[in-house]
C-alpha cells in the first residue's frame, strides 16, 4: 500500500535561521510556497542545481534531483555527492565540482558556466551542510546580485532570495514540498 502523498505543504512557516548565529543583517530571505519556487525555476533561462553530501542522509532526494536533471537542469554535484548519481546510473548534465571553487566562479557575471554556455540566472541549492550553504549564499548575495538564489533545502537559509521555512524535523513535509516544486516545474 502506497503512503498517502501530502499536498499543499506550507513552507512559509518557521522562517528563522536554523542556527541562530546566522543572522545576516537587515536583508533576510523570504519564504515561498513550493508552487511559486517551481514556477520561478521553470521560467529560468539558465538554472543550475547545486547539491551536496547531505543527500546521503536522505537518499530518496537523489531520485528527486535526477527527476529535475531530466528536465534539463544541469546538476553541480559538490563534495562526494556525485557518487549518489553514479550509483543510480545518471550522469547526464551532472558535473562534479568543489563547493568553494563553484562559489568563486559564480561570483563573476562573465563566467561561462559548467557547460560553457554562459552564467546562470537561477541557482537552486539543497543537501549542502548548513554553514557551507550559508557562506555560499552570502557570497552570491554580496558579490553577484544578478543570480537569483533559491534554496529548496530542509532549512531556512537567510541569505537566499527564496527559501522554505525550517522543515528539518518533518521529513514527510519536506519530501512533499520538493515534490510540489517538481510538479510546478512540469506545468
Swiss-Prot record:
Which InterPro entries has this protein been placed in?
CdhB, DHS-like_NAD/FAD-binding_dom
Biological process (GO), any one: methanogenesis, from acetate
Q: Which residues carry this modification: Blocked amino end (Met)?
A: 1
Annotated TM spans: none
**Assembly notes:** Heterotetramer of two alpha and two epsilon subunits. The ACDS complex is made up of alpha, epsilon, beta, gamma and delta subunits with a probable stoichiometry of (alpha(2)epsilon(2))(4)-beta(8)-(gamma(1)delta(1))(8).
Q: Which family does it belong to?
A: Belongs to the CdhB family.
Q: What does this protein do?
A: Part of a complex that catalyzes the reversible cleavage of acetyl-CoA, allowing autotrophic growth from CO(2). The alpha-epsilon subcomponent functions as a carbon monoxide dehydrogenase. The precise role of the epsilon subunit is unclear; it may have a stabilizing role within the alpha(2)epsilon(2) component and/or be involved in electron transfer to FAD during a potential FAD-mediated CO oxidation.
- What protein name does the entry list? Acetyl-CoA decarbonylase/synthase complex subunit epsilon
Organism of this sequence: Methanothrix soehngenii
Q: What lineage does UniProt assign to this protein's organism?
A: Archaea, Methanobacteriati, Methanobacteriota, Stenosarchaea group, Methanomicrobia
Amino acid at each position: 500500500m502506497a503512503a498517502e502523498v501530502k499536498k499543499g505543504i506550507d513552507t512559509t512557516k518557521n522562517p528563522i535561521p536554523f542556527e541562530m548565529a546566522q543572522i545576516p543583517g537587515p536583508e533576510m530571505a523570504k519564504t515561498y510556497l513550493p508552487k511559486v519556487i517551481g514556477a520561478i525555476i521553470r521560467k529560468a533561462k539558465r538554472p543550475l542545481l547545486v547539491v551536496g553530501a547531505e543527500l546521503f542522509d536522505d537518499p530518496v532526494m537523489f531520485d528527486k534531483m535526477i527527476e529535475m536533471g531530466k528536465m534539463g537542469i544541469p546538476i553541480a554535484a559538490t563534495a562526494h555527492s556525485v557518487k549518489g548519481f553514479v550509483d543510480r546510473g545518471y550522469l547526464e548534465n551532472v558535473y562534479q565540482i568543489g563547493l568553494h571553487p563553484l562559489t568563486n566562479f559564480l561570483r563573476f557575471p562573465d563566467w561561462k558556466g559548467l557547460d560553457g554556455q554562459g552564467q546562470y540566472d537561477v541557482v537552486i541549492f539543497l543537501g549542502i551542510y548548513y554553514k557551507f550553504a550559508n557562506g555560499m549564499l552570502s557570497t552570491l548575495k554580496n558579490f553577484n546580485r544578478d543570480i537569483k538564489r533559491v534554496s529548496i533545502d530542509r532549512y531556512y537559509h537567510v541569505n537566499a532570495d527564496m527559501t522554505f521555512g525550517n522543515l528539518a524535523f518533518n521529513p514527510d513535509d519536506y519530501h512533499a514540498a520538493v515534490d510540489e516544486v517538481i510538479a510546478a516545474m512540469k506545468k
